[in-house]
Amino acid sequence: MVKSICKCTALCGSSLLILMAAVSAQASDGQVEFTGSINDNACTISTENVKKSVDLGQVRVGDFANTVGATAGSVPFSISLENCSSATLKNAAITFRGQQSSSDPTILGMTGANQVAGVGIQINDARTGAKLPLNTASTDYVLRPQSNTFDFTASYVRLVADTEGADGKPGVRGIGTGQVNALASFDVTYK
């Protein structure tokens, strides 16, 4: 009988040891991090519009009328929004921002060294043809479900007029020649 109790105690002790080892192998600490965001955007900006390039091409100084505000080289461009839901927000407005011209704060100025003097970039709303000043929201666009495309134009704009010289001598040209680079960002405001 003592031998049987010893066997049972040894067997039970071994089983208990195995059970404790199994339990301690399953007990492991870990961590799960959940991230995300909640926004009130009605749409997402199309990936092709996150970093967009618009080539205004080459124009001649003579393509500009000799008045401040004269434009040349108008080029259309678009901003597309996708995955739109107009369930709560029905309209959107676009605001362009960037380095303002020192001559006219409503015009996008040149960036970088050795830029052409006397010109800037003017953005117009293609729906109306009206100038869209920097840091000023466009009129509202009505959002449609899924995809929306908003059309604009960009053009060179004269900021300095030519001056006439005295005594028949040539005057000073208001526009220089060379490379043009300007950078604008845009914000979409949902209403």
Model-derived segments and spans:
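C-terminal segment of classical bacterial N-terminal signal peptides
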Residues: 15-25
